[in-house]
From Swiss-Prot:
Lineage, top ranks: Bacteria, Pseudomonadati, Pseudomonadota, Gammaproteobacteria, Enterobacterales
CDD domains hit by this protein: Ferrochelatase_C, Ferrochelatase_N
Quaternary state and interactors: Monomer.
Function statement: Catalyzes the ferrous insertion into protoporphyrin IX.
A GO cellular component annotation in the UniProt record: cytoplasm
A Pfam family: Ferrochelatase
Protein name: Ferrochelatase
Key words, A-Z: Cytoplasm, Heme biosynthesis, Iron, Lyase, Metal-binding, Porphyrin biosynthesis
The protein's Enzyme Commission number: 4.98.1.1
Reaction catalysis annotation: heme b + 2 H(+) = protoporphyrin IX + Fe(2+)
Entry binding sites for Fe cation: 194, 275
Length: 320
């Protein structure tokens, strides 16, 4: 009897191919066309997206990408490739592919790569620690569409999320402690998660609870008094209410209150990207300091640290 051959698919959001208005426009068009991301009726959304949002936002977002672009590409792609390579090095007999919901390499190219390696079973690990319909749900949807076009469908194990997994919490705690050792213990540790529309949560998305689960476990692991830790939500888009409190407004408030030393961690981002390196490390730093704060440090994402790769090994082990 033939032994089952398993492959691993690491999934993340995606990134433009270049820091140019044209590349950003292509990426944003695909991203903002997904109903999991924006569920506004299409007759209303298409004219707004194509006639207003893409022409106005693409040049502006391209400039932001230019400020963080690395020699090997966008930070998200550089760190995601490092994660893939590090995990593959630890699992020499297991093919590991990288796929993005939007842009390239696509999820379909990752599935094709694994099938070409003759795998019978794919472990899908979306690198979103806290489930949301707009992230993990989008991976699930696209995976279904991809497999619907295949004659040979492999077995699939799909890891929904890992918000309170012990190895994940340990990796976050180690990263925070290293930052405290480097910068001193902050007056407030602010945990900033990507926001979603409040309506999504009202309709059943358990993302807010999964963020609270991560926060609770991390506070316990660090042994910090609860009053020294705050949980906020960033990157809101559009006019409808999103999860609160908002990161930028909270940092402004803390600066105005005279809070001297803030450190910010983004536990929901498995790899540094525009939302962490530009929005949090730069824009929100300015907000805090201009409001009266004294010291601000961003704690990097887990990226390809050994502890993060250990976590991936642990999460996928039951299915390999």
């Amino acid at each position: 009897m033939r032994q089952t051959k398993t492959g691993i698919l690491l999934a993340n959001l995606g990134t433009p191919d270049a820091p140019t208005p044209e590349a950003v426009k292509r990426y944003l068009k695909q991203f903002l066309s997904d109903r999991r991301v924006v569920d506004t009726p299409r007759l209303l959304w298409w004219p707004l997206l194509r006639g207003v949002i893409l022409p106005l936002r693409s040049p502006r977002v391209a400039k932001l990408y230019q400020s963080i672009w690395m020699d090997g590409g966008s930070p998200l792609m550089v760190y995601s490739r490092e994660q893939q390579q590090a995990l593959a090095a630890r699992l020499p007999d297991t093919p590991v592919a990288l796929g993005m919901s939007y842009g390239s390499p696509s999820l379909e190219s990752a599935v094709d790569e694994l099938l070409a390696s003759d795998v019978d079973h794919i472990v899908v690990l979306p690198l979103y620690p806290q489930y949301s319909c707009s992230t993990v749900g989008a991976v699930w949807d696209e995976l279904g569409r991809i497999l619907a076009r295949k004659r040979r469908i492999p077995g699939i194990s799909f890891i929904r999320d890992y918000a309170d997994d012990g190895a994940y919490i340990d990796a976050l705690a180690k990263s925070a402690r290293e930052s405290f050792a480097r910068h001193g213990e902050p007056d407030v540790l602010l945990l900033s998660y990507h926001g979603i529309p409040q309506r999504y949560a009202d309709e059943g998305d358990d993302y807010p609870q999964r963020c609270r689960d991560t926060t609770r476990e991390l506070v316990s692991a660090l042994g910090l008094p609860p009053e020294k830790v705050m949980m906020t939500f960033q990157s809101r888009f559009g006019r409808e209410p999103w999860l609160t409190p908002y990161t930028d407004e909270t940092l402004k408030m803390l600066g105005e209150k005279g809070t001297g030393h803030i450190q910010v961690m983004c536990p929901g981002f498995a790899a540094d990207c525009l939302e962490t390196l530009e929005e949090i490390a730069e824009q929100n730093r300015e907000i805090f300091l201009e409001a009266g704060g004294k010291k601000y440090a961003y704690i990097p994402a887990l990226n390809a640290t050994p502890e993060h790769i250990d976590m991936m090994l642990k999460l996928t082990a039951p299915y390999r």
